[in-house]
């Protein structure tokens, strides 16, 4: 009888990938990034073990919002004070803090538990074309072939 392979945390080999977000739709980029962070692109994927890789996303300021999402998509948060509901559009967030837009999108696609939190910590987003992870020798991942 064959048994299913279950990865152990010490056996996982992690790679580093760089993804250029220029002119890629936010949702399509986020689904690919979330899948790689979870490790679903590997044959050794195990749901209860963090088998994912590290992702560096550059040029977050050049992400594409399709349709009228830049003006119509709203993000809400509350300050926990009376009348403290704050609302910002996706376009405002892209102008002021483009890294946050990708982080919020990817975080919503990860599990809502400690495993998802640890997977989210392996995401590194930069607004410009430069990043500080050259020492890890990241591979350039062209996701236009995937999406």
Swiss-Prot record:
<dbReference type="GO" id="GO:0022625">
    <property type="term" value="C:cytosolic large ribosomal subunit"/>
</dbReference>
<protein>
    <recommendedName>
        <fullName>Large ribosomal subunit protein uL13</fullName>
    </recommendedName>
</protein>
<comment type="subunit">
    <text>Part of the 50S ribosomal subunit.</text>
</comment>
<dbReference type="InterPro" id="IPR005823">
    <property type="entry name" value="Ribosomal_uL13_bac-type"/>
</dbReference>
<keyword id="KW-0689">Ribosomal protein</keyword>
<keyword id="KW-0687">Ribonucleoprotein</keyword>
<dbReference type="Pfam" id="PF00572">
    <property type="entry name" value="Ribosomal_L13"/>
</dbReference>
<comment type="similarity">
    <text>Belongs to the universal ribosomal protein uL13 family.</text>
</comment>
<dbReference type="GO" id="GO:0006412">
    <property type="term" value="P:translation"/>
</dbReference>
<dbReference type="InterPro" id="IPR036899">
    <property type="entry name" value="Ribosomal_uL13_sf"/>
</dbReference>
<dbReference type="GO" id="GO:0003729">
    <property type="term" value="F:mRNA binding"/>
</dbReference>
<dbReference type="GO" id="GO:0017148">
    <property type="term" value="P:negative regulation of translation"/>
</dbReference>
<dbReference type="GO" id="GO:0003735">
    <property type="term" value="F:structural constituent of ribosome"/>
</dbReference>
<dbReference type="InterPro" id="IPR023563">
    <property type="entry name" value="Ribosomal_uL13_CS"/>
</dbReference>
<dbReference type="InterPro" id="IPR005822">
    <property type="entry name" value="Ribosomal_uL13"/>
</dbReference>
<comment type="function">
    <text>This protein is one of the early assembly proteins of the 50S ribosomal subunit, although it is not seen to bind rRNA by itself. It is important during the early stages of 50S assembly.</text>
</comment>
